[in-house]
A protein has these predicted regions:
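Boundary/activation segment at the start of structured domains
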Residues: 243-251, 257, 281
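Non-catalytic terminal/interface segments that mediate subunit docking, oligomerization
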Residues: 64-86, 107, 122-125, 132-133, ...
Length: 600
């Protein structure tokens, strides 16, 4: 039997059998050694090999998937209510003629990604645990508000005032703690802010642990991002730091709905494969969630590899068109590429083909990915979840190029959403696009409450106050305040003396953190290298060339000073994470970052 892309299937099978034999009798270490030797030999012989990509399939096999807990029928019902209320919030905001904007399609594509997190993974801060830290994708804010509405944390008045904040009862467009200080923990808009800030949050959490200022609790930093957002330089500019420092407390979930604001993210390529190679090269563990469980029987029957070949060959622009055109089109243009692939679906109706779901809409596949991500040791994890932009919002909206800009829906589209998600509205009620919240004693609300109680409390939530630091007397700065007495002094020299004075104060010296973007010598801070030590997540494994000097370059795992390299955005992100440590850790810190403003 010929495999697609294989000119000698028998020889291939012999190699695979030999590898399986080594694996069985000599173990994974020997198998990995042999593969590495073959790879090195191939490179030496100039054989072109793409090593950073895995097949366009789910990383976690069906056999490896854990059993999913909870009542999935109930969770599906709750997810439908959240979807509806998120949709209603945006539509009502644009129904009055004010055209306030908002986003329908982003949350529609990622509802399952959030739902599985809220029901099974996101742990809240409480008396016994510091809590996970979650960066929510900005355009998905309506969905988070909709969940809080069902939980009773927000009222219908709040939802009716989405993007109307003047009177104090409104909801901001995007996550921001300044606007909702009890609710949003982190700002994530403009796009690119969430990615870099989440990396440096994880970095600072490890820094504080390594200095013994907070305890190790296996807290996770989750960041929800978009595939289009990955084009922001801030999104991927710091991923090497996460890999280099082995930030296994960091989990990114990239919603790969294949579309950005105007059109496809990579119409002529495959964004999931591109991101996989990028993150694997930076030392991340990559978990791909490409196909939902309805594909599993077809893949199991794909003995020739024809279906897998079609999956590999199809570009993202074509996947988008397949979603728009439906089952009959997919039968001809996708499965019809190879007779063996077409044979796999001969007993499926066009509707059955339509129901072949993407991985990011399958709670079982998403749960498996999250569970695996939470076991990470020594690597950050990125989950690349394939979804449909505007999922469930009718054929007029799903996957079309203009979906991101749609703020209003026709009555027929609303009927489609109602019927698809089994919502309790008649045609007349649909005209008003009403919010819906079951009674307090309903099974849905009881289930939501129980799940959040099991995970420590409701989210999002933000601590506004923390322990107080002892403020030093002004006399601490006497040497500076009395002036230079006729001697010339630079402002940077004075600043260094102020920092040095604070670092001598017993009550706060551990909380003062000098941060430099590779400009310590410029500012005259090199004396702190040896005195404080430069933080290095993995310690110092070399002897610096200036070891014999008093102010030598000393790195240490418990180093006090942050040297972020030529990286002002990273230094500012580290400063923000430390400055808000009072909220995230109940640990006030005093970060001191001298920003070289002439280049800012």
């Amino acid at each position: 039997m010929a495999f697609y892309g294989d000119t000698d299937a028998q020889e291939t099978q012999e190699w695979q059998d030999a590898f399986d034999s080594v694996l069985q009798h000599m173990g994974t270490e020997r198998a990995a050694f042999l593969l590495e030797k073959l790879y090195q030999q191939a490179i030496a012989k100039h054989v072109p090999i793409q090593r950073l990509n895995t097949p366009y399939l789910n990383t976690i096999s069906v056999a490896e998937e854990p059993a999913m807990p909870g009542d999935q029928d109930m969770e599906r019902r709750i997810r439908a209510l959240i979807r509806w209320n998120a949709l209603a919030m945006v539509l009502r905001a644009n129904k009055t003629g004010d055209d306030l904007g908002g986003h329908l399609a982003s949350f529609a594509s990622s509802a399952t990604l959030y739902d599985v997190g809220f029901n099974h993974f996101f742990r809240a801060n409480n008396d016994n645990f510091g809590g996970d830290m979650i960066y929510y994708q900005g355009h998905c804010a309506p969905g988070i508000y909709a969940r809080s509405f069902l939980e009773g944390r927000l009222t219908e008045e709040h939802l009716n005032n989405f993007r109307r904040e003047v009177d104090g009862v409104g909801l901001p467009s995007y996550p921001h703690p300044y606007l909702m200080p009890d609710y949003w923990q982190f700002p994530t808009v403009s796009m690119g802010l969430g990615p870099i800030m989440s990396i440096y949050q994880a970095h600072i959490q490890k820094y504080l642990m390594n200095r013994g200022l907070i305890k190790e609790e296996n807290r996770k930093v989750w960041a929800y991002l978009g595939d289009g957002e990955m084009d922001e330089p801030e999104s991927t500019g710091a991923i090497s730091l996460a890999g280099r420092e082995k930030l296994d407390n960091l989990i990114w979930v990239v919603n790969c709905n294949l579309q950005r604001l105007d059109g496809p993210v990579r119409g002529n390529g495959k964004i999931i494969q591109e991101l996989e190679s990028l993150f694997r090269g930076a030392g991340w563990r990559v978990i791909k969630v490409v196909w939902g469980r309805h594909w599993d029987p077809l893949l199991a029957k794909d003995k020739t590899g024809a279906l897998k070949s079609v999956m590999e060959e199809t570009l993202d622009g074509e996947y988008q068109r397949l979603q728009v055109k439906g089952g009959a089109y997919a039968r001809e243009k996708f499965f019809g590429k190879y007779p063996e692939a077409a044979e796999l679906i001969k007993d499926l109706s066009d509707e059955d083909i339509d129901n072949l779901n993407r991985g990011g809409h399958d709670p079982y596949k998403v749960f498996a990915a999250y569970a695996e991500a939470c076991t990470a040791k020594g690597q950050p994890t990125v989950i690349l979840a394939k979804t449909v932009k505007g999922y469930g919002l009718s054929d007029e909206i799903e996957a079309v190029n203009k979906t991101h800009q749609i703020k209003k829906m026709q009555i027929e589209s609303l009927k489609y959403v109602r019927d698809r998600f089994n919502l309790p509205f008649n045609d007349e009620q649909l005209e008003e696009v009403p919010f819906y919240r079951p009674s307090e004693n309903s099974p849905e609300l009881k289930y939501m409450k129980a799940r959040r109680e099991a995970l420590g409390g409701y989210l999002p939530a933000r601590r506004k106050e923390s322990e107080q630091l002892a403020i030093p007397e002004l006399s601490v700065f006497d040497a500076v305040l009395k002036g230079s007495q006729g001697k010339e002094q630079s402002t940077t020299m004075v600043m260094v003396r102020l920092i040095a004075a604070l670092l001598k104060e017993k009550a706060i010296k551990d909380r003062v953190v000098p941060i430099v973007p590779d400009e310590a010598r410029t500012f005259g801070l090199e004396g702190m290298f040896r005195q404080l030590g430069i933080y290095a997540a993995n310690g110092q494994h070399y002897t610096p060339e200036d070891q014999e000097q008093l102010m030598h370059y000393r790195e240490a795992k418990d180093g006090h000073m942050l040297q972020e390299g030529i990286n002002e955005a990273g230094a500012m992100s580290a400063w923000a994470a430390l400055a808000t440590s009072y909220s995230t850790n109940n640990l006030p810190m005093i970060p001191m970052y001298m920003y070289y403003s002439m280049f800012g």
